[in-house]
Amino acid sequence: MKKITLTDKRKNNYYYNEAIKTLRTNIQLSGQSIKTILITSCFPNEGKSDVVLSLAQELGSIGKKVLLLDADIRKTAYVGRLGVEEEVRGLSQFLSGQANINDIIYETNFENMDIIFGGPSAPNPSGLLSENVFQVFLKKVREYYSYILIDTPPIGTVVDAAVIGRYCDGAVFLIEPGNVRYKDAQRALSQLERSGCQILGAVMNKIDTKADKYYSFYYIHYGEYYRRAEEENK
């Protein structure tokens, strides 16, 4: 396994960090069988990748071995986000037969956290993710990790998350209140449910914590989001 140094320049506030700890606790309380977790959102730019990275770091800090898998093989963001300047190989190259597993898993300088980058943009992402090779790959790597956190493209725009959901133990749905309509969230969640993946809960992101005007988030069961949204639409 290759080693790589990542740079995280984010400066998260107290409320954000506490929310991450709450999310981590809820993930752990979901049960020992929940290891492969898909994290998606309705639309782009809702802060999903920041939450995935923070959750991976938090789980690693308590001794859990974590694999962060960037499954957005349409438009990967982690290379630039984490200051990677060297050439790396990624998931799209593995799925297309251009690399093997050992070529794409990188040991990072973050405690107990490995990463797989998305790789170059693939011409047929949902097709590659539907292949048996991806399912076999997930079964193999889950033997070595406490948690596999899969960052997918937004399910409200492309079908990839629903395809990946067929092979996952659970899913977390990220929502930015005020910018995502209830009907859009309901439609996206319904598509994810049809994949057969258990929805563990929802993350309400970019919540204005009035105490310090920073953005934070909190974790709720997704059914609670439905109830609140319905009340707001009355």
Predicted regions and their residues:
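Helical hairpin unit composed of two closely spaced alpha helices linked by a short loop
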Residues: 61-67
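Conserved nucleotide-binding/hydrolysis micro-motifs of P-loop NTPases
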Residues: 73-75, 100, 120-123, 155-156, ...
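Hydrophobic anchor at the start of a short beta-strand
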Residues: 66, 148, 171, 199-200
